[in-house]
Amino acid sequence: LDAVDRIVGGLEKKTKVMTDEEKRSIAIHEAGHATISWFCRYANPLVKVTIVPRGQALGAAWYIPEERVITTKEEELDQICSLLGGRAAEELFVGAISTGAMNDLERSTKAAFGMVAYTGMSEKLPNICYYNNDEYSFQRPYSETTAKIIDDEVLRIVNDQYKRAKQILTEHKDGHAELAQLLFDKEVIYREDVEKILGKRPWTSRSEELIKENERLEAEKKAKEDADAPKLEDMPDEVKQAQAEHEKAIADKTRDNNLDKDSKDQSTENTKK
């Protein structure tokens, strides 16, 4: 994970000085992301949370991005809710919001805009795509009236998920507080730490389902190979004899090697004396 951290997040800035108040605020923010993603079924699985500054970030939560062939509306909403978990935690448990959520707000707004303008997931503009592949065009492919509807729908989606994030954090405020304190003390926590505090997730992630399915297929493949492999008792006598001689030769060679090693060790010991 250290190599991935350096590539994705940049080098650690251990010399960056923070007050305990700033450090606690960042811990509460990152614990907010971790808590929301833990209780949102379709949020990417959590791997690690840190409040050690890297690059431009003062803290970060690392997830396993799930490579989905398609993405449902529920999955998009869970990701937006998870992104807003840090800002929601600041409002609820710090009592003041900060600029630390800027990247989260940018990503959640872009995701909501994509749902409304590109993938037809809006209640007021269903099944409509306003995507314009002319990157040099200064004209939007919709009217001012539609632009107002898009703005309103983006705002509604973000606000709804922000309220949802605050509700989840309120329901699990004790777990969040314990998580934030552990993060404040240790600076880095992992999935196992989150599971000890918040309990096992009531569902498996898509990544976990794919891993289990792959393990099942591998087990079936091995069982079939074992079943198709010729058994010793079914082999001709000459093959059985050759197999036995081969195994005996390996055993003899191993024994001789061990004897040579013991002899050399004894000779070395006598020389020292």
Predicted features and spans:
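Soluble catalytic regions of large protease machineries
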Residues: 20-28, 34-273
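P-loop NTPase nucleotide-binding/switch module
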Residues: 5, 9-20
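C-terminal helical "lid" of AAA+/P-loop NTPase domains
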Residues: 1-3
